[in-house]
Amino acid sequence: MHPLPEYPRPSMRRDSYVNLNGPWDYAITQSSEFPAKWDGAILVPYSPEAKASGVGRTLQPGQWLHYHRTFTPPAGEGGRVLLHFGAVDYACAVEVNGRLAGGHRGGYWPFTLDITDLLRPQGRNTLWVAVQDPTGTGTQARGKQTLRPGGMFYPAQSGIWQTVWLERVPENYIDTLTVIPDYDARTVTVKVHTSKPGGAVNLWAVVRAGGVTIAEDWGSDEADRKSV
């Protein structure tokens, strides 16, 4: 069973969801290079500083925290395969099968990488994440994290600390979805952005209460639709 097995983004749940939480190989080194050996296993999505991770070590400025695991892509064919990170503190680079998939800076924001073109058509795939967290030495937002906890400050947390998951989507898929209810006007405004805006994509919005449809409307991507 995965830690935190629930779908992390219920407003855009897809059936192709594959949870990558669980044991990963890890190593803490002084280099950004792929480690020659692994220090053991870390339980993602808990930071190495947390007891729940099974590690209990503090990542120091200048050190690199490496994660590694194998995975099988979501079932199905065609479309795109997206790799989602709920959050990684602070800066990271991600490789799939030895090729750079992308990176991210900022410890509090989710990010997504399209890894379709990096996948092997058969067999298992490898995922490597290299992380740095210059707590106390950089200009990044840190809240109350510090390497010298005390008073209102708590120990710094590093690395992957939110769910990691895969999903398979169509070539043109819903990228962002915003639902704005207006109780007084008795309307719901639905804002949908697709991955390839401007295409001839029809969208259908349905509002249900207790299993009963109370409103529905059609529209196109990049357009607002109000259901009354």
Question: For the regions a protein language model found, what residue spans apply to each?
Answer:
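Accessory beta-strand-rich segments of carbohydrate-active enzymes
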Residues: 5-11, 25-31, 57, 61-174, ...
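Short, solvent-exposed loop/linker segments at the N-terminal edge
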Residues: 180-186
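Conserved small/polar residues in nucleotide/adenosyl-binding loops
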Residues: 227-228
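Predominantly extracellular/luminal regions of secreted and cell-surface proteins
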Residues: 20-45
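The feature marks proteins involved in alpha-glucan
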Residues: 44-48, 151
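Structural beta-strand segments of beta-rich domains
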Residues: 81, 186-192
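N-terminal glycine-rich cofactor-binding segment
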Residues: 48-56
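N-terminal helix-cap/turn-to-beta initiation motif at the start of protein domains
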Residues: 12-21
